[in-house]
Amino acid sequence: MVNSTVYEKVTYKQIDDMKHALGFDKRKVRGIKHRRYEPYRNYFNTGERDVDDWEQLVSIGFATKSRENWYHVSDDGKIFLERVTGVSFLPVIQNK
């Protein structure tokens, strides 16, 4: 469950990085009353310069790490993004 006291620790850059990890494109948001987005991915390769930002997201539970420099937005991270953007994030599209 997302603890609202950690919200103030998240920077705008981290929010943008989390949206980028999910492939977020506001032009592909569906619905008017119940806005939703179906991500086609959930991964972010940090290289070397974004590692600290993502490690902070991992420490507060908004991301997970799969291997060196590869991160994924966690379920709590998606809940946080839903509250920030007003858009529900559906499960990642699997290859069809």
Predicted regions: what is each one?
Residues 69-74:
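Minor-groove-contacting beta-hairpin "wing" of winged helix-turn-helix DNA-binding domains
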Residues 21-25, 61-62, 84:
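Generic structural signal for hydrophobic core residues of well-folded globular domains
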Residues 58-68:
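A short, conserved structural fragment
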Residues 27-28, 63, 90:
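A general structural signal for well-ordered secondary-structure junctions
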Residues 2-51:
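Short amphipathic alpha-helical interface segments
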Residues 75-96:
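Short, amphipathic alpha-helical interaction segments positioned at domain boundaries
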